[in-house]
């Protein structure tokens, strides 16, 4: 009995506790990411943004949470009630479940599986089903058109993201996210005789793929300038037209969880994860999770600045960019990187 408890029960309890702790921390982080998004946009437009609830508006997201929770959900007449309510739940659960394999620091991961990046790519591909379900179950043409646009957009840019990931995997030789970060201890900088620093990270040696991944991440998460499925001037509010209260909150939560995931993936694949920018003793004292969080926040700041400055694309421009520019460019980079690795004997 004791061996059964120590072998199965206790590890399960620890994993559940870790999952709950990560979930709570992630939800709080998303609340402040949402606030930061509004604050940055307001600052660019010379406004103050949310500043009433709490000091500097720090509790605005929690006030919005209470507002959504206590509002009555309204289901349209003729809608498929079960699918209508299931769609936002599917979206948010899939978006949150991907974080189980994301290493926040060395050893700070719930499931350190050897196919971590493949797991994230597979789960992220399933998120489009929640959007399609929500648009179809609303029994309205505008949400359905918005859902179709969103599905086409996400599928289009997943191909480019997949090729970018393949390029990184060719350089690292592993699907494990921790191995991808550790492989960035040495890189282009050390080959040139420089000390270990941010010049070794993949953003420099794979710079074209870094740009493609960043722009594709914007499109994958329906962020501006690729927010066509939700653009007020395009299709009212996309697939979320008929949603309100808690179901709408779940869609927003899933969207920002996916945005945070893309920031974390950019950090892991190209910005060295939890590695300090320069390998010196004083920076190595800083916990890895601090470096990881700072890098992810920097990537999100870039997301927010793109939202503030770049005008929205037309739908045909969006599709042309994905299929006629990013797809051939990323495919060519895969071939070039594989050729260089084989030629130099690094494969």
Curated annotation (Swiss-Prot):
Coiled coil: none annotated. The keyword Transmembrane helix applies. Its EC number is 7.1.1.-. GO terms for biological process: aerobic respiration. Its main location: membrane. GO terms for cellular component: plasma membrane. It catalyses: a quinone + NADH + 5 H(+)(in) = a quinol + NAD(+) + 4 H(+)(out). Keywords: Cell inner membrane, Cell membrane, Membrane, NAD, Quinone, Translocase, Transmembrane, Transmembrane helix, Ubiquinone. Belongs to the complex I subunit 1 family. NDH-1 is composed of 14 different subunits. Subunits NuoA, H, J, K, L, M, N constitute the membrane sector of the complex. This is NADH-quinone oxidoreductase subunit H. It comes from Rhizobium johnstonii (strain DSM 114642 / LMG 32736 / 3841) (Rhizobium leguminosarum bv. viciae). The gene is nuoH.
């Amino acid at each position: 009995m004791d061996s059964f408890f120590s072998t199965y029960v206790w590890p399960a309890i620890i994993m559940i506790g870790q999952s709950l702790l990560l979930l709570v921390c992630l939800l709080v982080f998303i609340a402040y990411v949402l606030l930061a998004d509004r604050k940055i946009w307001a600052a660019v437009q010379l406004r103050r943004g949310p500043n009433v609830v709490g000091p500097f508006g720090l509790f605005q997201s929690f006030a919005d949470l209470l507002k959504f929770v206590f509002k009555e959900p309204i289901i349209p007449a003729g809608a498929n009630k079960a699918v209508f309510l299931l769609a936002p739940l599917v979206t948010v659960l899939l978006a949150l479940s991907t974080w189980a394999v994301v290493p926040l620091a060395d050893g700070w991961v719930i499931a350190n599986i050897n196919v971590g990046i493949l797991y994230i790519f597979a789960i992220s591909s399933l998120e489009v089903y929640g959007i399609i379900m929500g648009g179809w179950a609303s029994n309205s043409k505008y949400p359905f058109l918005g859902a179709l646009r969103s599905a086409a957009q996400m599928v289009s840019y997943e191909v480019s993201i997949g090729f970018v990931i393949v390029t990184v995997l060719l350089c690292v030789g592993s699907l494990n996210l921790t191995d991808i970060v550790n492989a960035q201890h040495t890189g282009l900088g050390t080959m040139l005789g420089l000390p270990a620093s941010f010049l070794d990270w993949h953003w420099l040696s794979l710079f074209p793929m870094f740009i493609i991944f960043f722009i594709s991440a914007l499109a994958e998460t329906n962020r501006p300038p690729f927010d066509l499925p939700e653009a007020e001037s395009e299709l009212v509010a996309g697939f979320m037209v008929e949603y309100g209260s808690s179901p709408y909150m779940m869609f927003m939560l899933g969207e920002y969880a996916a945005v945070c995931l893309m920031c974390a993936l950019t950090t892991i694949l190209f910005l060295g994860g939890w590695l300090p920018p320069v390998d010196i003793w004083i920076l190595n004292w800083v916990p890895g999770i601090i470096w990881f969080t700072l890098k992810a926040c920097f990537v999100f700041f870039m997301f927010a600045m793109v939202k503030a400055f770049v005008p929205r694309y037309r739908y045909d421009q969006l599709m042309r960019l994905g299929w006629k520019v990013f797809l051939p460019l990323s495919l060519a980079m895969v071939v070039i990187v594989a050729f260089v690795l084989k030629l130099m004997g690094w494969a």
